[in-house]
């Protein structure tokens, strides 16, 4: 089944000076959930991540996420499996009222140094709806069959 959605939310962005020649975030395939984000490190100063190190990598853009949505910053599976490169605090959340440059916390969990070069696809960004709840303090919660069973309580 093919669905044509002409009512997609609009993601407005501002290109910063450090993002001057970078491609806009984009979906690599028609069915992709996430847009690729690229590294806005200087071309003559690639960033070297040694095993165990982490770095805050600029994207070169400010995003105006539509109200009622968030941008989730997630690792790219290829970087993770091939090189051990992942995003910390994943998924990272960009709130709709944030107006600073989006940066990605990358960590090298691999065994070898990894070089991040200008324009390299470093993460993916998923735009997702947000639900804000009303908070109510109570003295107890309703009972369930599971109860307070936590980690591993439903089986392996």
From Swiss-Prot:
Pathway: Pyrimidine metabolism; dUMP biosynthesis; dUMP from dCTP (dUTP route): step 2/2
Binding-site positions, substrate: 76-78, 89, 93-95, 103
Pfam families: dUTPase (PF00692)
Cofactor(s) the protein requires to work: Mg(2+)
Record EC number: 3.6.1.23
InterPro entries noted in UniProt: dUTPase, dUTPase-like, dUTPase-like_sf, dUTPase_trimeric
Record SUPFAM superfamilies: dUTPase-like
A GO MF term: magnesium ion binding
GO terms, biological process: dUMP biosynthetic process; dUTP catabolic process
Signal peptide: none
Cystine connections: none
Catalytic activity: dUTP + H2O = dUMP + diphosphate + H(+)
Keywords tagged on the record: Hydrolase, Magnesium, Metal-binding, Nucleotide metabolism
Domain of life per record: Bacteria
Primary role: This enzyme is involved in nucleotide metabolism: it produces dUMP, the immediate precursor of thymidine nucleotides and it decreases the intracellular concentration of dUTP so that uracil cannot be incorporated into DNA.
Family recorded in the similarity comment: Belongs to the dUTPase family.
Protein name: Deoxyuridine 5'-triphosphate nucleotidohydrolase
Organism of this sequence: Agrobacterium fabrum (strain C58 / ATCC 33970)
